[in-house]
């Protein structure tokens, strides 16, 4: 049920994204879409690490896009369409009503099955998380982890040294 609601929200956000004209509103819709995608991946994957890293990567890219967009279109007026908001609210309400009009016994059976599955898999999930973290920091893979840490640190230093304070794609402040 939760998956259906989140996927419905993704479809509605995709529809709204196609109707947006201002770059900042497009960025906001893309950020919400990314958050919903991360929620879906966290439902399917047993650990939240993948969806967390995915969200951070998208957020970093969105921050860079936000800087470029605000420097290039800073004087453009931002306005929200009331009719678009109303249409999306009506579509979401219709989907919610359709979900709740499904046979109640199927919904109750689905909820009890999910609760029983959560209770039975809780111990397996805890043990699996501990084992996956142990694998990451034990001998064969700890070298890859250290290499990744050093590479990211070196990339950070090179990026700081390459960028100059008064040059670049952003407009100078007067």
Curated annotation (Swiss-Prot):
Protein name according to UniProt: NADH-ubiquinone oxidoreductase chain 6
GO molecular function, one term: NADH dehydrogenase (ubiquinone) activity
Source species, domain of life: Eukaryota
UniProt record similarity statement: Belongs to the complex I subunit 6 family.
Sequence intervals crossing the membrane: 25-45, 48-68, 82-102, 143-163
Sections of the chain in a coiled coil: none
Reaction(s) the record says it catalyses: a ubiquinone + NADH + 5 H(+)(in) = a ubiquinol + NAD(+) + 4 H(+)(out)
Keywords: Electron transport, Membrane, Mitochondrion, NAD, Respiratory chain, Translocase, Transmembrane, Transmembrane helix, Transport, Ubiquinone
Pfam families: Oxidored_q3 (PF00499)
């Amino acid at each position: 049920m939760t998956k259906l609601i989140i996927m419905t929200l993704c479809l509605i956000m995709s529809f709204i994204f196609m109707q947006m004209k201002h770059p900042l509103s497009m960025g906001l819709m893309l950020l919400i879409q990314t958050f919903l995608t991360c929620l879906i991946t966290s439902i399917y994957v047993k650990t939240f690490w993948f969806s967390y890293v995915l969200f951070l990567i998208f957020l970093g890219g969105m921050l860079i896009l936000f800087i470029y967009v605000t420097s290039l279109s800073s004087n453009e007026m931002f306005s929200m369409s009331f009719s678009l908001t109303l249409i999306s609210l009506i579509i979401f309400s219709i989907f919610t009503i359709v979900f709740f009009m499904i046979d109640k016994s199927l919904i109750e059976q689905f909820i009890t099955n999910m609760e029983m599955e959560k209770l039975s898999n809780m111990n397996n999930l805890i043990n699996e998380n501990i084992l996956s973290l142990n694998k990451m920091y034990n001998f064969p893979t700890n070298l890859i982890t250290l290499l990744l840490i050093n590479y990211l640190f070196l990339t950070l230093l090179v990026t700081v040294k390459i960028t100059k304070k008064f040059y670049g794609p952003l407009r100078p402040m007067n």
